Every structure is written in structure tokens, then in C-alpha cells.
């Protein structure tokens, strides 16, 4: 399994996927791309990516209009240089706390905090199977099987515990 991120797919045929001028053969292609900005944002006067219509935001979530904040997969959040935060649930989850604080800070006229995404790796599940890649603190680059399935469940349980309660996360474990 090879996971590629950050490249625009220009074409797909029955044998190959094309990333710009380069082609790569595939047996099974799972394409999870296509994230675009919402129509109201696309039609706004805010600075946005012309291709995806996602809003450009500074690391404090402010857009070209300092009264408008953007977060999650609706935004290209500056991470320094030419880098933007990935449009993942993990990034949105960690960004949300700082973005929420910044809304309050903006209302009070206080300085805004910057946010920097820390990539902790990727865990993907398809049906009963899972694969994990580049997971922080684990010396193996890519792995699957029981370890990846357990990691994926633990990520979901952590989220449930955070938004609900640890008791609910424990009771949901067997259904994940």
C-alpha cells in the first residue's frame, strides 16, 4: 500500500493515475481527494485558492478579511513557507481549540495565537482492515493488521471520550 498526499491528480485511466506529467500504475485506487471550498466561500471576495476555492487563512485562522476566520477543510491554513495544514479531521480537531480561543481574543481586542499542525501520522480503515503510516513514536514506517486496527479504534475512542465521556468511549469500543 502506498499513500500519497499533496499531489493533484490530473487524470485516471483503467491502468494508471497521472500526477501532472508523471504516471503511476495501480491495481486498486482509493481516491480521497476533491476537497473544495463551500459555495458561499467560493462566491465571496475573500482570498481563496482558484482551483479548490478553499479560503486562505493565516496560522491564526484569519482570512483576508480580519473579521472572518476559516478552519478545517474549508481553509488553506498557512504553516510557513509554501506549506498548509492538511484537510484532515486530526488537523481540524487540534486547530478548533486555538480557533475558538482566537474568536474570543478577537472580540476582546487581544493578540491572536498562531497554530502549527503536528502530523502524528495517518491511520486509514477500509471495512474491517486498516493501515497506519508514519505514526509518531512508532519505529515502523507503515503497518497494518491488528496493530493498525487497534490504533484506528483508539483514535476514534479518544475523540468520543473528548466530545462525550470516557464511559461512552469504552462502551462504543466493541462497535468500532
What is each stretch, according to the model?
Residues 2-4, 69:
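General small-molecule cofactor/ligand-binding pocket signal
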Residues 5-16:
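A conserved short coil-to-beta-strand element within the FAD-binding core of flavoproteins
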Residues 15-94:
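FAD-site-proximal beta/loop scaffold in flavoenzymes
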Residues 90-117:
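Internal hydrophobic alpha-helix adjacent to the cofactor/substrate pocket in enzyme cavities
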Residues 128-176:
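C-terminal auxiliary extensions adjacent to catalytic cores
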Amino acid at each position: 500500500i502506498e499513500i500519497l498526499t499533496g499531489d493533484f491528480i490530473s487524470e485516471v485511466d483503467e491502468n494508471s493515475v497521472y500526477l501532472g506529467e508523471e504516471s503511476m500504475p495501480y491495481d486498486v485506487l482509493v481516491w480521497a481527494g476533491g476537497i473544495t471550498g463551500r459555495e458561499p466561500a467560493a462566491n465571496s471576495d475573500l482570498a481563496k485558492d482558484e482551483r479548490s476555492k478553499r479560503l486562505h487563512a493565516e496560522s491564526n485562522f484569519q482570512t483576508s478579511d480580519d473579521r472572518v476566520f476559516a478552519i478545517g477543510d474549508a481553509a488553506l491554513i498557512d504553516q510557513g513557507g509554501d506549506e498548509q495544514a492538511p484537510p484532515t479531521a486530526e488537523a481540524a480537531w487540534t486547530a478548533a481549540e486555538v480557533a475558538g480561543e482566537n474568536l474570543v481574543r478577537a472580540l476582546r481586542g487581544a493578540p491572536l495565537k498562531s497554530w502549527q499542525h503536528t502530523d502524528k501520522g495517518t491511520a486509514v480503515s477500509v471495512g474491517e482492515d486498516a493501515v497506519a503510516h508514519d505514526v509518531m513514536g512508532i519505529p515502523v514506517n507503515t503497518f497494518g493488521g491488528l496493530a493498525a486496527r487497534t490504533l484506528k479504534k483508539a483514535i476514534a475512542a479518544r475523540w468520543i471520550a473528548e466530545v462525550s465521556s470516557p464511559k461512552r468511549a469504552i462502551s462504543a469500543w466493541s462497535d468500532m
